[in-house]
Structures are given as C-alpha cells and as structure tokens.
C-alpha cells in the first residue's frame, strides 16, 4: 500500500502478553550492509550478475529469527535461514521448530537439531514441488532423533502415493 511506513527490525525481546514473549534475532550487521549496497546498485541500474548471484547466495540468511516463549514452551521460527548460518550461535532448546526453506537439505544439520532438541518439527511445504523438498535426508534425521514430525501437505511415499497425514494448527 502506498504510504505505508516501513521500519527496520532490530534484535530484542518484547513481552506480547503477560505470559508470551517474542525474541527477535538477526545476523550481524555486515550482511545487511552488503544486501543494502547490492539493492542500491540494482535501483541505480549498476548491479551486475556477479552481485545478484552473491545476493542469491546469502539473502535467506537475512531472515528474522523469531522465538516465541510462553511459560515452558519455546517455538523457534527461523525464517528461511540456512542451518550453517544459525547453528553458529548458542541456541537454547525449544519445544517446536518450524524448519526453514521447506525442509530443504540445508535447513537443518545434526548439530543444530541436537542443540534445539525439539519435541516437534514442522515443515511448511507443498507436495507439488519438483525439487527435493522436504529432503528425504531431513525427514530421516528428524525421525531418527525421535521428534514428532508434521508437514503442511502430504508427502508422497516411495511409490508416489499420497496419503492422509498429521496436520498441525496453532491457536494463540
């Protein structure tokens, strides 16, 4: 909408209700400065393919990582960050994590899954995707850790058959 005010997100913790807190976590400033410089070059028609490929390689890591905490329950919402980006941080365990990037092979690593130690993992993905999302290796890793696994669309089995699946619904 024209005239809508845009403001930059900044890291911090905000009480949303007496029992619900939101933590906003971002990567270090240099990644955002580089992103801004590339976008400025695009707007001024000075960007080259090399810069656009560079941006494509890191833009998902500019996602806001949001953690919602209500009493003993923590929900980790990492946007589209690649696992190798956010696993560099000390992250406390959570109750539920929504995997980034539709469960792509780069969305989680064994180290990150160990650190998060979630009881439940959610993957937002459509079964009409033609890429490897969710990745079979990710599904296997999550199942081997004993996490409850929910997807937002059915995943075809090895024979291509799509059956009913557990779904998840959030009420806040």
Where are these regions (language model features)?
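Flexible, acidic/histidine-containing loops and adjacent segments that form or flank the divalent-metal
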Residues: 1-76, 147-172
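C-terminal functional module detector
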Residues: 25-26, 106, 115-119, 123-161, ...
């Amino acid at each position: 909408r024209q005239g809508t005010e845009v403001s930059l997100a900044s890291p911090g913790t905000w009480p949303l209700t007496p029992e619900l807190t939101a933590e906003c976590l971002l990567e270090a400033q240099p990644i955002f400065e580089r992103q801004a410089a590339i976008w400025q070059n695009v707007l001024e028609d000075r960007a080259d393919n090399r810069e656009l490929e560079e941006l494509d390689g890191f833009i998902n890591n500019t996602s806001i990582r949001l953690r919602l905490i209500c009493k003993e329950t923590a929900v980790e919402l990492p946007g589209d960050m690649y696992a190798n980006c956010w696993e560099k941080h000390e992250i406390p365990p959570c109750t539920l994590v929504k995997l980034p990037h539709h469960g792509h092979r780069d969305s989680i690593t064994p180290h990150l899954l160990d650190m998060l130690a979630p009881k439940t993992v959610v993957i937002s993905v459509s079964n009409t995707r033609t890429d490897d999302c969710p990745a079979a290796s990710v599904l296997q890793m999550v199942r081997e850790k004993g996490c409850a696994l929910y997807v937002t669309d059915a995943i075809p089995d090895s024979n291509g058959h799509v059956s009913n699946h557990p779904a998840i619904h959030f009420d806040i």
